[in-house]
């Protein structure tokens, strides 16, 4: 038997906590026997004193075990259970293509996703732009979709890592969100509760990333890989660029539209293709679905070319209560904004810099994201045809096309887009799309 205040005191004095102490405290968070003040105190001591790798693994596993941990053995799946998690960005629509692509190659992807947070878009918000799409199927239906379709994208239920929800809410109001061990545990508790064989992390770097610097993004990626592997799940991470909008669009319906066009081969943004392929390759290798990168890329290209990935996406949409003919008739189902009009730079030149975070906030300001959890979303608004870094813009080539609900909203977004994108006489060197891979 432990006392919460003694655990806090021990960590306050710079000592490492035992697995039993950490589990006692996390179970207390779940059972409401630990107060909000005690949660805040422990969070602050961890913020200042950090955690050893064994502590980080214990914290993550205790938070995972605070609720249901999914088990797929009874389904007798004939392939690995794998997933991807992104730290979030703008125009990051990879999940919608990656899930069906990996499923078409023999993987099973029980993806538990989130809503938009701050400037970053949320996969669930994008999918809810599809009429009828159900992000909370019951457990039996979820398992049925995984077995028969291969991929489902759902929201986090109260039974998964419930301690994380309360812990995070306290961190949010006590300036302890940006602690590497706490971020790591929060991300992984939910992902490891999916009962995975392998996980791939997409950790963003740049002006639209969650972490403010390359060094911190790298530190987070290394922490996640170390903890997840320590918890028994094969995990690798890719550091990918978020110094510009990843897709050609940013919003909800506009990104779903781009995802369908990507899967059907109608249009594939080169940077989006590179990131999606790189993440899928990692998933196939980690899951034992390919022997090397060359084989993995060939398999992935094949399921794109032969329409299998697009077909699986369509089956997932139908299985989650969306329209059965969505892939063929997506334009009929996706909402369109009242006003769609291009915004041009004030001068001709090359795009040299982009404040990706500001572009994400411009979409939020139009109604495409939430400022607070209770806000409703306008799924139709957003940006499309985004200019890329290094691209020439002029009176013919706009910075973007803005899809807005009114002229006033368009004007506000146009000013934000122009302020967020720097245009100069000479083209700057563009960043790599994938900076590095971390496997241990």
From Swiss-Prot:
Pathway(s) it belongs to: Pyrimidine metabolism; dTMP biosynthesis via salvage pathway; dTMP from thymine: step 1/2
HAMAP family on file: Thymid_phosp (MF_01628)
Protein name stated in the entry: Thymidine phosphorylase
NCBIfam families assigned to the protein according to its UniProt record, in alphabetical order: PRK05820.1, T_phosphoryl, Y_phosphoryl
UniProt keyword Transferase, yes or no: yes
Entry keywords, A to Z: Glycosyltransferase, Transferase
Protein EC: 2.4.2.4
A cellular component annotation (GO) from this entry: cytosol
Quaternary data: Homodimer.
Protein family: Belongs to the thymidine/pyrimidine-nucleoside phosphorylase family.
Gene Ontology MF annotations: 1,4-alpha-oligoglucan phosphorylase activity; thymidine phosphorylase activity
């Amino acid at each position: 038997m432990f006392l919460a205040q003694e655990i806090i005191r021990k960590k306050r004095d710079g000592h490492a906590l035992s697995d039993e102490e950490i589990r006692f405290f996390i179970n207390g968070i779940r059972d409401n026997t630990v107060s909000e003040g005690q949660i805040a105190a422990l969070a602050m001591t961890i913020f200042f004193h950090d955690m050893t790798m064994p502590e980080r693994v214990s914290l993550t596993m205790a938070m995972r075990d605070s609720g249901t941990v999914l088990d797929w053995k009874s389904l007798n799946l004939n392939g690995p259970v794998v997933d991807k998690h992104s730290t979030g960005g703008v125009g990051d629509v990879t999940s919608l293509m990656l899930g069906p692509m990996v499923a078409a190659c023999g993987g099973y992807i029980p993806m538990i996703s989130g809503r938009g947070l701050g400037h970053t878009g949320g996969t669930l918000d994008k999918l809810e732009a599809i009429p009828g799409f159900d992000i909370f199927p019951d457990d039996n239906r979820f398992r049925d979709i995984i077995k028969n379709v291969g991929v489902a994208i759902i929201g986090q239920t109260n039974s998964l890592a419930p301690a994380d929800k309360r812990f995070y809410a306290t961190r949010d109001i006590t300036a302890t969100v940006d602690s590497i061990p706490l971020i790591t545990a929060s991300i992984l508790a939910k992902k490891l509760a999916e009962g995975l064989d392998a996980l791939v992390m997409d950790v963003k770097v740049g002006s639209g990333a969650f972490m403010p610097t390359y060094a911190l993004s790298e530190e987070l990626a290394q922490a996640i890989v170390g903890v997840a592997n320590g918890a028994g799940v094969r995990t690798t991470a890719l550091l990918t660029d978020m110094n510009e909008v990843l897709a050609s669009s940013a919003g909800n319906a506009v990104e779903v539209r781009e995802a369908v066009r990507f899967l059907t081969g109608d249009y594939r943004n080169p940077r989006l293709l590179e990131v999606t392929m790189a993440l899928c390759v990692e998933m196939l290798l980690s899951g034992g679905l390919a022997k090397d990168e060359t084989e993995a890329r060939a398999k992935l290209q094949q399921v794109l070319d032969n329409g299998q990935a697009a077909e699986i996406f369509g089956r997932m949409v139908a299985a989650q209560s969306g329209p059965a003919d969505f892939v063929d008739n997506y334009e009929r189902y996706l909402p369109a904004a009242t006003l769609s009009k291009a915004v041009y730079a004030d001068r001709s030149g090359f795009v040299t810099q982009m404040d990706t975070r500001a572009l994400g906030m411009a979409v939020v300001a139009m109604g495409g994201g939430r400022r607070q959890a209770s806000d409703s979303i306008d799924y139709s608004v957003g940006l499309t045809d985004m200019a890329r870094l290094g691209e020439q813009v002029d009176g013919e080539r706009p910075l973007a096309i803005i899809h807005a609900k009114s002229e006033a909203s368009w004007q506000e977004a146009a000013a934000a887009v122009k302020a967020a994108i720097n245009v100069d006489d000479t083209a700057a060197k563009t960043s790599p799309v994938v900076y590095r891979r971390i496997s241990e």
